[in-house]
């Protein structure tokens, strides 16, 4: 074998805690791709809806870029019995939620690439009969195109404060990058696909569409050519369309798929170093 193989065991694969550094970006900063210098990198992820013995891949963008956003809404507190003396941050938040969804439906060129804005957390108030002073919305942006990402960021920074102002309140928007676009180098992908077909069989190597999940493996790919793909772990007898999703209590995969993942990664390594 004409070369060196480096195994990377990454902590905080799902990202570090808010306000902390971690995951792939921290490893890159600490020199994981140096000494010896890495020329190419491969990543593999199990998938509960892909049949055992198969793998799926896509050249270029395969997983979305992701940002975490926080919108802080400021109003004026009052008793629930006298809403006319308040500036209700909950009402403002509802209008902001509706407003930013129009960024996807009315501003984004969805025939080009998909995009997602999801608000997963809303916090406001502590009593049923008090209109609170503030509210906070926390969510994620997913994009497969940098121009669309910039459009969404710009429109969110425009819409939220202007909507809040229209109701007599104010709003600030803070957006932080959590993962760049997971981008499979086309030249490395072509070489990898030929290797996978040799190892697993041509019919077991399938092309896929991009997904709006995100992966901080992209931090490695920003420095060196990379190839990221998915390994089959579908439970026998389950329908791919009904397989429990990742990050749910029902998630389950067939361990029989792991041997195919080992074979795939070994084959990729040996073929690259020939």
What are these regions, as identified by a protein language model?
Residues 1-121, 126-130, 240:
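Histidine/acidic-residue-rich, glycine-tolerant segments that coordinate divalent metal ions
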Residues 94-274:
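Metal-dependent amide/peptide-bond hydrolase catalytic core
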């Amino acid at each position: 074998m004409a070369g060196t193989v480096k195994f990377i065991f990454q902590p905080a694969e799902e990202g570090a805690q808010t306000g902390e550094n971690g995951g792939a970006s921290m490893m890159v900063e600490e020199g994981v791709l140096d000494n010896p210098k890495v020329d190419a990198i491969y990543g593999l992820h199990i998938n509960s809806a892909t049949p055992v013995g198969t793998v799926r891949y896509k050249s270029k963008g395969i997983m979305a870029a992701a940002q975490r956003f926080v919108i802080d809404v400021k109003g004026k507190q009052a008793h629930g019995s006298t809403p006319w003396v308040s500036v209700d941050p909950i009402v403002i938040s509802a209008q902001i939620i509706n407003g930013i969804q129009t960024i996807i439906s009315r501003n984004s060129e969805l025939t080009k690439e998909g995009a997602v804005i999801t608000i997963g957390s809303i916090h406001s108030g502590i009593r049923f009969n008090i209109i609170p002073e503030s509210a906070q919305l926390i969510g994620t942006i997913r994009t497969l195109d940098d121009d669309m990402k910039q459009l969404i960021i710009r429109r969110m920074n425009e819409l939220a404060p202007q909507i809040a102002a229209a109701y007599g309140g104010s709003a600030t928007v803070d957006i932080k990058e959590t993962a760049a676009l997971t981008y499979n180098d086309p030249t490395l992908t072509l070489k990898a696909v030929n290797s996978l077909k040799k190892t697993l069989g041509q019919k077991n190597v399938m092309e896929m569409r991009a997904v709006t999940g995100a992966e901080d493996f992209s931090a490695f790919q920003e420095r060196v050519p990379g190839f990221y793909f998915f390994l089959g772990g579908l439970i026998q007898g389950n329908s791919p369309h009904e397989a429990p999703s990742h990050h749910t209590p029902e998630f389950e995969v067939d361990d029989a798929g792991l041997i195919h993942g080992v074979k795939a990664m070994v084959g990729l390594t040996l073929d690259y170093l020939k």
